[in-house]
């Protein structure tokens, strides 16, 4: 298998952590790719993902799996199933719903990054950027109060949440999430004890 990814992508980090935790990391070849709004990458769009998003998992038969959650679920299935994503029952739907929130938080944070760094300064839309940041911030508040998510055995929600917090450090270093959300701070410190989390930290901004 080959994973098209960027070391800076929180979505790709989620897949990398999942692969390590599932014991599959040695079965994946990592291929660095660059996708930037407004910049052409026709080869990636035509050959890998028309949406021009990372990561993408290219299987040995040439087929492609896109979306970080779908890739993580595929890897979980390869590892026997039910390890990071519950196989059935109410727990499965809680995990899928919580992960959808995390995915939306990361989407909003990425849009804030693009608004500031990619969009021409004269077109910057402050209210739109603030609205998207608030979605991520209120999402953090929700998880800060969720003792179950913060304390249960490792799953894809916890992996996704630590990627949210890591991306906040990477791209929004002065946002103050540790001061605002002490339970998330303790959770992040505990998660950083895992090798999979430590070695996947984004490069210095």
What positions do the PLM features span?
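Short coil/loop linkers at secondary-structure junctions
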Residues: 25, 82, 175-178, 198
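Non-transmembrane alpha-helical segments in soluble domains
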Residues: 72, 76, 96-99, 140, ...
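GST-like domain detector, emphasizing the conserved glutathione-binding G-site
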Residues: 1-124
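Charged phosphate-binding loop/patch that engages nucleotide di/tri-phosphates or the phosphate backbone
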Residues: 186-200
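Conserved residues at the C-terminal ends of beta-strands
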Residues: 60, 162, 203
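GST-like fold's C-terminal all-alpha helical module
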Residues: 102-189
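Generic structural signal for secondary-structure transition and capping sites
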Residues: 80, 107, 148, 196-197
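Short, hydrophobic secondary-structure boundary micro-motifs
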Residues: 82-87, 152, 198-203
